[in-house]
Amino acid sequence: MKRQWFKQPLHRLLHALNTGDASLPEIVTSFYQRIGTREPLVQAWQYLIDEEDYLAEYESNKAFYQASPLKGLPFAVKDVIDTAGIPTSMGSAIHAERIPSMDASCVTAMKAAGGILIGKTVTTEFAYFQAGKTNHPHDAERTPGGSSSGSAAAVADYMVPIAFGTQTAASVIRPASFCGCVGYVGSRGEFSLRNIQPLAQSLDSLGIISNHVLDTQLIRDVLLQKSLQAAVVAAKPVLNFTVFDGQNLGEVSVEMLEALAQCQQTLLSHGHTQVAFPFVAEAVELTALHGQIMAFEVARNLVFEQQHTGLSEHMQGLLHTGLALSYGEYIAALARVEAIKQILLQWMGEQKIDVILAPAAAGIAPLKTAGTGAPFMSRAWQVLGLPTVSLPLAYHQKMPLGLQLIAQ
């Protein structure tokens, strides 16, 4: 029986190549066959490299790829991440013909480690709220989330083992939660943003979307120029954790709250320690501050685009809000965020908090008629610049629910 290599996570594909259980062309063909079958329904791709061109690149540099850490395996990037010679339209008709001359740093790092770009994934308009064409891989009537919609859908549907997204509010964590993937956003400044189209520079982050935490660790090591030894996740004997359920920020579904409570009880039953979370009011304030900072910066970054008629009503509304904010209000918001961050980090240090548990989204993916989903569960952590990860936690109506972990 023919192996379905496309269903294997990255680290297992690497093992198969290292042991001779599979060849690179065999694995790549498996992914292209999956894309050919599923893309008409999911519509995750903005631009796809032709299979013949992919394999020709591998064959022309076969010795390099066989000796490289990633062995020529495929990766994808969100269509706000520059790729030399390949269009980067940022989900907007305004930039439909834009072809960058340089790769983004994350693309360069992946290529240097032996990854081969398979394509660009669909993004919402300028990585904000206006949805693209992508459907949820488990239910075409539902949103895959935004703005890294194509990246999450492509990974969740086994069309590619690794995809990069970006997050300014909740654009990696939320779609990862909706689609049932692992979504990782590093600490502010952990990954280079060079040649990634900016939305709000104080908030923008690069994210990794995968189907396994070991794959996320491997790709994190690639971006940080670390040696790619076999990834090992070390378990801590006793975890000190706190829980924030997000109900003060907006409506969180009963199913999400029940899944979070079950996770909490499981940790306690295994001897881990919970500390009460005392910063609910600050989380609400941070969420509002995030909105102010984002609106101010987006309005100043998209000056060129404001002159065009192709902007969505969503984006026009954000620009209107941002232009109404003064520089003094913006600076005050940044200062307040920093003050809260220092208090929170001091408390986490004193209490020896390893992780904050929270919903990764308000619930399962909503119907597309309701938009791309509410981002309020990530705004506070994103404005603080803390590292976050979304992990598949449970299912409701056969749709994934994600757990968000926030660290220092």
What do the PLM-derived regions correspond to, one by one?
Residues G72, A112, I116, V160-P161, ...:
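Glycine-rich, small-residue loops and helix-cap segments
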Residues F31, K78, M110, L267, ...:
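Conserved hydrophobic/aromatic pocket- or pore-lining residues that grip, position, or stack substrates
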Residues R12-T19, H95-R98, D204-N211, H320-L325, ...:
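Short, well-ordered beta-strand elements within core beta-sheets of diverse protein domains
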Residues M1-I99, A127-Y128, A365:
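Short, well-ordered alpha-helical
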